[in-house]
UniProtKB/Swiss-Prot annotation:
The keyword Repeat applies. InterPro entries: AAA+_ATPase (IPR003593), ABC_tran_Xtn (IPR032781), ABC_transporter-like_ATP-bd (IPR003439), ABC_transporter-like_CS (IPR017871), ABCF_ATPase (IPR051309), P-loop_NTPase (IPR027417). This is Uncharacterized ABC transporter ATP-binding protein YfmM. Residues 4-260, 324-518 form the ABC transporter domain. Coiled coil: none annotated.
Amino acid sequence: MSILSVKDLSHGFGDRAIFNNVSFRLLKGEHVGLIGANGEGKSTFMNIITGKLEPDEGKVEWSKNVRVGYLDQHTVLEKGKSIRDVLKDAFHYLFAMEEEMNEIYNKMGEADPDELEKLLEEVGVIQDALTNNDFYVIDSKVEEIARGLGLSDIGLERDVTDLSGGQRTKVLLAKLLLEKPEILLLDEPTNYLDEQHIEWLKRYLQEYENAFILISHDIPFLNSVINLIYHVENQELTRYVGDYHQFMEVYEVKKQQLEAAYKKQQQEVAELKDFVARNKARVSTRNMAMSRQKKLDKMDMIELAAEKPKPEFHFKPARTSGKLIFETKDLVIGYDSPLSRPLNLRMERGQKIALYGANGIGKTTLLKSLLGEIQPLEGSVERGEHIYTGYFEQEVKETNNNTCIEEVWSEFPSYTQYEIRAALAKCGLTTKHIESRVSVLSGGEKAKVRLCKLINSETNLLVLDEPTNHLDADAKEELKRALKEYKGSILLISHEPDFYMDIATETWNCESWTTKVL
């Protein structure tokens, strides 16, 4: 029996259709990968099945009493609560049961023998439920999940409103896993996780007995935990049994078969039309022409989906920089307290350096310190001459009400509208996306708008903080190619070895200089 059933679903935003009469089912224990290019509607689908969005048409039916857990990175965390408090909120229904049990105990003092027996039965039922749901080992469960996702390193007594976006996501994911719902809905859970914690989450999901729906552009991760694919493309939702690689094989075969059938049909249509045109006027052949016309009219025409624009990234070079990019002398980074021991680092022209290591140890802080956005606690940074820097930040917090055209135009006022549109199209954005406000775009589309601005700026140093977060497989592959081709210097933070190992001329393990206990 289906835990979730979606029938005849259609939805769109304005004149932009997202889904057209699609169906979906989820059975107990299925591990589903929901895949598709940026902007095809994966997150929209999640919002519809969780009731955050009302579909234009169609039915969404959950089986009764099913508990659904959704990793929503926009959840507001209550000020004044510690990480531990939020994680223990996962068991709020058990604490409510304990409260109910304590109230029953209070009633026992005044109960007659018959009432007492009834109350003891009620207490027994609650006691069993608490025991079966690990109520008496909650603290150790919280500690176990917190360790697995690296929250213990941050400190469980820390106020949740002081956390970075990545740390907030970890807290929300940990709470969700502690809730153990019948269904997990995970929208890009690895975006803010480092390699160690991605590996932990991978093992957790591989052993997860219940069902989940996972959106992820990290293909090795996705492939290791799913047994079913739903592919979102051209307003359709198609089911494939197997992992991502098996899906790609079947998808390519189906695509080739459809193209061959389309070509054959187009040839037949051309021949029929030609026959009708040549023979409809003659009395002797008019009946045959009418017969061919009827065949044409009844024909189910095969339609090929319009090819989505593939991104093309070509970074504009600035003049050659000096030999030195930067050199640090006894640099100590941090805000209120040190995040590093004194650092003596040097980068020279042409180097492509990937920084890796656990979350929260100061990788982003190091980048901002090298760029001069944060003052060091101690030591100094010497920057080279003729450096033209392009900086891609991991998080952009402010709401952006510009259209994509306005956003890029504000950076390049000398461009014509045609040039702006062409630049955005080269980043894989369609006309509908280009004319939309940045605030309504998906995470991947927003990243492409930011990349568009970076690509069209003249640079000889790229500083990139997790640039692949939210990018679909095509965009990620094209970005990798463009960075390998780039003639300047690169300083890159990434949690994906599959991405950075092909680009980097050397890697720096930031765990070797952090003051954090790992």
